[in-house]
């Protein structure tokens, strides 16, 4: 059975859009830090007959019949997640990282309680207390930031804020912070003020799993993450704990607290991704992600473009475009015109609005999946610099796009295997 052929016949409009998106991914350099390319096996699992099955509850404790096989799948996903992150408890049902965070808040907090996370403009996340998010509307959100000189965490300042505000929950883990997170120092501060400590490792989960970034599990009361990004799985969420008894309270906060039936086809895809991440070659992949990010950062620095914090320890490279008198909005448009996908982003102490910004956020996870190495990323950095430093030069624009397409052809997405896998 050719699944896409069936789709083409039954809904040619959607089929054409899917093919257009496939072509876009093949012919563009994906540098959005929160994106990656899932394996064919992961996509096959999430496109399986498991999408037909309703399974409210936990394995062996369902509210529906016919769950014997999805029980096996979900239990396997749980065991693999625990092994991957050295945790004693896991819930694989959250539909997203935001849903995982919401379940934690429901378990640990009451409306009006004080939570403390990084300011969104400094690299935090909407779900860590932004006023436009439920976390900032239901709770008293206070924020910490980075040091103005170094753009890195300053634990003396964080401790002072915690001592003054006495939060019930401290959140560490970010969406645009390129440096290593010291979870032990956060634990010490949380203990001093009597707060719960939650780590949101959505961006660095793959690096943590590969033991290339410190693991928050020993230090935090609860850990949340997405399953895509550096973990390279399907879009979804995950909650982890070192204390199995403590973790059980989050089960009820996921269901029935914040969700209904779990997406068992996505849970199967998570299980596949966890198995992939447990293989030795995934460590090699994660090592390459970091190597590539360092090369990308140094290439841009050598061309006179400032990088927030002066470099990176993970997959994120955050450009501070004030060094070339450009906004993130303009830079995003310029690189998109040569088939490079990135996103405008605020930088610490940004004078521009979130709709304009002074930064451009890049990530190396997706292109590393395509096989890009340090030499290839040096070329990517040169292309970006050439485009940003010559915004009105149409000849250079054309040359940059040509160089991008050459790289795309050199490192094909799925190497032509995608069509064969669906027949």
From Swiss-Prot:
Catalytic activity, EC: 2.1.2.1
Site label Plays an important role in substrate specificity, positions: 228
Binding, (6S)-5,6,7,8-tetrahydrofolate: 120, 124-126, 353-355
Cofactor(s) needed: pyridoxal 5'-phosphate
GO molecular function, one term: glycine hydroxymethyltransferase activity
Transmembrane regions listed in the UniProt entry: none
Pathway where this protein functions: One-carbon metabolism; tetrahydrofolate interconversion; Amino-acid biosynthesis; glycine biosynthesis; glycine from L-serine: step 1/1
Localization annotation: Cytoplasm
GO BP field: glycine biosynthetic process from serine; tetrahydrofolate interconversion
Classification via InterPro entries: PyrdxlP-dep_Trfase (IPR015424), PyrdxlP-dep_Trfase_major (IPR015421), PyrdxlP-dep_Trfase_small (IPR015422), Ser_HO-MeTrfase (IPR001085), Ser_HO-MeTrfase-like (IPR049943), Ser_HO-MeTrfase_PLP_BS (IPR019798), SHMT-like_dom (IPR039429)
Chief site of localization: cytoplasm
Catalytic activity: (6R)-5,10-methylene-5,6,7,8-tetrahydrofolate + glycine + H2O = (6S)-5,6,7,8-tetrahydrofolate + L-serine
Role summary: Catalyzes the reversible interconversion of serine and glycine with tetrahydrofolate (THF) serving as the one-carbon carrier. This reaction serves as the major source of one-carbon groups required for the biosynthesis of purines, thymidylate, methionine, and other important biomolecules. Also exhibits THF-independent aldolase activity toward beta-hydroxyamino acids, producing glycine and aldehydes, via a retro-aldol mechanism.
Subunit record text: Homodimer.
Protein name: Serine hydroxymethyltransferase
Source organism of this protein record: Prochlorococcus marinus (strain AS9601)
């Amino acid at each position: 059975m050719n699944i896409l052929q069936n789709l083409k016949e039954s809904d040619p409009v959607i089929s054409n859009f899917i093919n257009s998106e496939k072509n876009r991914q093949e012919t563009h350099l994906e540098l959005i830090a929160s994106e990656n390319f899932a394996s064919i096996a992961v996509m096959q699992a999430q496109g399986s007959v498991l999408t037909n099955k309703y399974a409210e509850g936990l394995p062996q404790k369902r509210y529906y019949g016919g769950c014997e096989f999805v029980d096996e799948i979900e239990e396997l996903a749980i065991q693999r997640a625990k092994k991957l992150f050295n945790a004693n408890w896991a819930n694989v049902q959250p539909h997203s990282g935001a849903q995982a965070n919401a379940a934690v808040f429901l378990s640990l907090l009451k409306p009006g309680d004080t939570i403390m996370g990084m300011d969104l403009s400094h690299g935090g996340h909407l779900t860590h207390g932004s006023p436009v998010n439920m976390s900032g509307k239901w709770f008293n959100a206070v924020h910490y930031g980075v040091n103005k000189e170094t753009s890195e965490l300053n634990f003396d300042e964080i401790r002072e804020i915690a001592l003054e505000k006495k939060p019930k929950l401290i959140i560490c883990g970010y969406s645009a912070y390129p440096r290593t997170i010291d979870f032990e120092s956060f634990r010490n501060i949380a203990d001093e003020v009597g707060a719960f400590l939650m780590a949101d490792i959505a961006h660095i989960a793959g690096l943590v799993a590969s033991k290339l970034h410190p693991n928050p599990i020993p230090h935090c009361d609860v850990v949340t993450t997405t399953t895509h990004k550096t973990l390279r799985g399907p879009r979804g969420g995950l909650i982890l704990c070192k204390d199995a008894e403590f973790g059980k309270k989050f089960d009820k906060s996921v269901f029935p607290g914040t969700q209904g039936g779990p997406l068992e086809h996505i849970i199967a895809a998570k299980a596949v991704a966890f198995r992939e991440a447990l293989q030795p070659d995934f460590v090699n992949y994660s090592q390459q992600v970091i190597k590539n990010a360092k090369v990308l950062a140094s290439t841009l620095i050598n061309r006179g473009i400032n990088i927030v914090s002066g470099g990176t320890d993970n997959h994120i490279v955050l450009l501070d475009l004030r060094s070339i008198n450009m906004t993130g909005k303009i830079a995003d448009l310029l690189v998109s015109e040569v088939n490079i996908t990135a996103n405008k982003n605020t930088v610490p102490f940004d004078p521009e609005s979130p709709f304009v910004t002074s930064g451009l956020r890049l990530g190396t996870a997706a292109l590393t999946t395509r096989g890009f190495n340090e030499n290839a990323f040096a070329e990517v950095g040169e292309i970006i610099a050439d485009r940003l430093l010559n915004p009105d030069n149409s000849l250079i624009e054309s040359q940059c796009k040509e160089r991008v397409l050459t790289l795309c052809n050199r490192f094909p997405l799925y190497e032509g295997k995608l069509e064969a896998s669906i027949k």
